[in-house]
Structure formats: structure tokens, C-alpha cells
Amino acid sequence: MKFESASKFKKQIKKLYRTAFPANERAPLFMLHSKTKHINNSFCAIIDNNEFIGLVYTISNEKWIYVFFLAVEESMRGKGYGTSILKHIQSENPGKTVALMIEDTSDKTVPNYDERIQRLKFYQNNGFKQLNISINEAGVDYELLGTDTNVTQQDFLNLMRGFLGSKLLYKYLYRKMNKQ
């Protein structure tokens, strides 16, 4: 399995990105590509045996690495690629906490509750813990997971402020952050 620049696989990246993430959960692709010019951001296509498997977008600093987007082609799911990608990220960033967001699992009335719990269990099986940090992004409630509990709400906000800039961060994404 190889991690290659997403710019080499724009067509496959675009297709997977649009099918794996609802429109209200996607950042503009042009922005993601342009932000990879910064040393702390990485947008990769996952390739195995010359076949496109998935995508991963990460943002990092000296303390931790945030998995902004991770998706595996539907036909490749259930074959261990998600776990392999997460293990690769962890092995390439020794000493750093790896964190990511999933849709909030506290509301049992949402239509995709079982899917949310299944996703939570997948990440827990890969060493992630619930950090008790809730984030509302573009009207969707999320919870932050991490491989260690040393990531705080302020850490997350600072990382995203560095990525998006203060005005964009407030205006579009993080008007509501709650630590439960």
C-alpha cells in the first residue's frame, strides 16, 4: 500500500470524495488541494497494486495529527484498508496523538444511529478513545476521537484556526463548540 499525492489522482479523488461525504460535510476540493502547499497538510491517494483504494487528508502540528478526511472505495471496504491507513498514519507520526471526528453518537433518534455506532466501534478497535469534545460543524454534530486523551478543545480550535484562518473558522464552521 502506498500513499501518493492526491494531485496525481484528481478524477478518482473527486469521485470518491463526492460519494463518501455528504455535501454539507465537504470542504471545497480546490481549497484542500491548495492547502497542501503548507508543510503541515497532506492530501494523499491510497494505492495498492496500482489500484486506487481511497483518500486521506491530514493536518498536523508538533503535538498531534488530525485526520480531516478518510475514505475507502466502497468495493474495497471490509478488507482492512481503513485499519492499514490508520496504522500507517500512526507509525509515520511516532509520539503524536492521532485525532478525528465522527458524527455524534449520543443521539439515538438519528436515522443512521447504527451506522454511527459501527463507525465508533471501528475506531475504538483501532485504538481511538472518545475525548468528550463535541463540535458542531455546518449544522452537523460531531465528537472528537483520539489515540490519546491529551488533545483539548483549545488544541483542536488552534489547529483548525491555523488551517482555515480565524474569520473562516468562525463564520462557517465552529460557531458552536462544547466540551461535555
Named regions from a protein language model:
Residues 1-27, 154-159, 172-180:
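Short amphipathic alpha-helix that is part of the acyltransferase structural core
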Residues 19-43, 47:
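Active-site rim helix/loop that mediates acceptor-substrate recognition in acyltransferases
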Residues 41-45, 55, 142-144:
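Short hydrophobic/aromatic beta-strand element in the GNAT-like acyltransferase core
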Residues 45, 50-59, 64-71:
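Conserved beta-strand in the GNAT
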Residues 70-77, 104-106:
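A short, internal acetyl-CoA/4′-phosphopantetheine-binding micro-motif in the GNAT/acyltransferase core
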Residues 72, 78-92, 115:
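Conserved acetyl-CoA-binding loop-helix of GNAT-fold acetyltransferases
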Residues 93-115:
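Conserved GNAT acetyl-CoA-binding A-motif
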Residues 115-116, 136-180:
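C-terminal "cap" of GNAT-fold acetyltransferases
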